[in-house]
């Protein structure tokens, strides 16, 4: 028996739907809007539907990242998912792990202390990321990622529970130079950094290597990127630092640390292989030592302040303790 392509007509498929975007979905990306309409559909299927032109906005083709406006007409094609109620959900143990990682929640948002190795969202061979798992935990709620963290970075990941909170938080994220959301990271850098604050103001450009892998480098044609590094403690010839960033570019801290000549410990992409090997053998560091430790912002036009913190992951605390 051959597998059914869910984008092809078959059996008792639902018909084409024309959906008018409501006011509370204005500003939402097309792919996220479709994920809400096609419950249980994997993100890869949504992208396939968009790329193939089966999804239309106001009668025309659109890109997955298009921001919708209130009143837009979205054509949602008939989709046949697996007979067993779409697809299997996230494993129970993984769901419990993420539920225990929630460090803050109110009526508008929740904050997750995302473990290293967990993607912010699924796709590209990843069945379940943090957002898919949280949606499985809270099937009656509308949850949307406010931002993303690299898969190997641990720490604060913010999820909006209301459309109004998502819009306000994303507007704050667009305000560079710390005007919107103040972000603080903890990291271990290779080598001995000098005292004081070291500011890296170096534009970053995202390129693609063979095979489609993203690679970021300092380049004059890139986007403005500013990071401030400060040594908290020196251990074993290396520097435990806090980093405050004014911009939120892809791999920003990792590439700026490399640019300083003090790459992030455990960084397989931008780091020093010899240092990584030595730290793996000496202190058992098997992951990227980069942690999103705190976020500060205010909602309601500055009237409701939030100060969110995520404790350093146990494996990083233990690695630091072994580093003498």
Model-derived features: where do they sit?
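Conserved hydrophobic positions within beta-strands
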Residues: 102, 189, 228-231, 264
């Amino acid at each position: 028996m051959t597998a059914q392509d869910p984008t092809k007509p078959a059996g008792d498929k639902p018909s084409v739907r024309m959906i008018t975007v409501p006011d509370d979905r204005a500003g939402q990306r097309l792919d996220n809007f479709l994920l809400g309409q096609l419950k249980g559909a994997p993100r890869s299927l949504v992208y396939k539907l968009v790329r193939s032109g089966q999804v239309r906005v106001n009668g025309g083709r659109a890109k997955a990242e298009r921001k919708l406006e209130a009143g837009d007409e979205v054509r949602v094609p008939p989709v046949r998912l697996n007979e067993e109620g779409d697809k299997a959900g996230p494993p129970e143990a993984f769901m419990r792990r993420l539920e225990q990682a929630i460090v803050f929640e109110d009526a508008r948002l929740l904050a997750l202390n995302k473990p290293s190795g967990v993607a912010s969202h699924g796709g590209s061979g990843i069945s379940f990321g943090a957002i898919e798992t949280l949606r499985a935990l809270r099937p009656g709620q509308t949850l949307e990622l406010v931002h993303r963290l690299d898969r190997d970075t641990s720490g604060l990941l913010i999820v909006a529970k209301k459309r109004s909170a998502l819009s306000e938080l994303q507007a704050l994220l667009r305000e560079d130079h710390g005007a919107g959301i103040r972000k603080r990271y903890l990291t271990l850098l290779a080598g001995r950094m000098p005292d004081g604050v070291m500011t890296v103001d170096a534009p970053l450009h995202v390129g693609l290597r063979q095979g489609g892998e993203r690679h970021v480098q300092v380049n004059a044609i890139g986007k403005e990127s500013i990071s401030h590094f400060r040594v908290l403690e020196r251990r074993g010839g290396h520097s435990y630092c806090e980093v405050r960033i004014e911009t939120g570019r892809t791999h920003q801290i990792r590439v700026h640390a490399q640019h300083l000549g003090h790459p992030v410990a455990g960084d397989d992409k931008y780091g020093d292989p010899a240092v990584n090997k030595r730290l793996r053998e000496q202190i058992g560091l098997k992951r990227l030592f980069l942690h999103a430790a705190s976020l500060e912002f205010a909602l309601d036009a500055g009237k409701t302040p939030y100060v969110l913190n995520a404790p350093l992951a146990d494996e990083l605390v233990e690695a630091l303790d072994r580093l003498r």
